[in-house]
Amino acid sequence: MRLNTISPSKGAKHSSKRLGRGIGSGLGKTSGRGHKGQKARSGCSIHRGFEGGQTPLYRRLPKFGFTSCKATVTTEIRLADLSKLQDNLIDLKTLKKANIIPKKIKWVKIILTGDIKRAITVRSLRVSKGAKLAIEAAGGKIE
């Protein structure tokens, strides 16, 4: 069997109904769209949230909150991710070079998820209390 010889099983594919081809087809005249109305017209698509002209829910409710710009340039990384690195010195440049964080990230915090078995040096990164204890227990240090 080759890819160019494969075909669907008999009866697996249904031919599509041809619309507007006489009343004998079952889909003639109005082509299954009913009579008149907004949805019977061509080019019709009622957008999500449309409530028939009444002010929709997303406009009746007040706005709240905002998106912090800081969230786009900060991230957290797990302690387990650091154990994948070969370098003993961990800083922002090292993490970007190893593709652990995107290039646009400016601030990183190391959190305690997973464990680390070798001594590493963390330079100019924020570290949670638990991660700090784990790094120091493995013989590493935080600068």
UniProtKB/Swiss-Prot annotation:
Residues 1-48 are annotated as: Disordered. Binds to the 23S rRNA. GO terms for biological process: translation. This is Large ribosomal subunit protein uL15. InterPro entries: Ribosomal_uL15, Ribosomal_uL15/eL18, Ribosomal_uL15/eL18_sf, Ribosomal_uL15_bac-type, Ribosomal_uL15_CS. One of its GO terms (cellular component) is cytosolic large ribosomal subunit. It holds the Pfam family Ribosomal_L27A. The keyword Ribonucleoprotein applies. Keywords: Ribonucleoprotein, Ribosomal protein, RNA-binding, rRNA-binding. NCBIfam families: rplO_bact. Gene3D superfamilies: 3.100.10.10. Disulfide bonds: none annotated. It comes from the Bacteria. One of its GO terms (molecular function) is rRNA binding. Transmembrane segments: none annotated. Residues 21-31 have a biased composition (Gly residues). Part of the 50S ribosomal subunit. Belongs to the universal ribosomal protein uL15 family. Residues 11-20 have a biased composition (Basic residues).
